């Protein structure tokens, strides 16, 4: 059974991936992030969900931030 934090992480990652139209969504999984990073991921999620569109450099920066938050 998954924890509420894992479910929250999964939902946020899926929403970020959809918003950014990431083609390789399977590469980013909730299991790759520790519960300790949920606050940082929540901040990133809020920022992504507020914007309508992203420049290529913004998308790259977001992808790099996601990578830095991984375990």
Swiss-Prot record:
Superkingdom of the organism of origin: Bacteria
Keyword Phosphoprotein: yes
InterPro entries in UniProt: UPF0435
Residues with the Phosphoserine modification: 57
Keywords, alphabetical: Phosphoprotein
The keyword Phosphoprotein appears for this protein: yes
Positions of transmembrane segments: none
Family statement: Belongs to the UPF0435 family.
HAMAP family found in the cross-reference section: UPF0435
Protein name in the entry: UPF0435 protein YfkK
Organism: Bacillus subtilis (strain 168)
Chain's gene name: yfkK
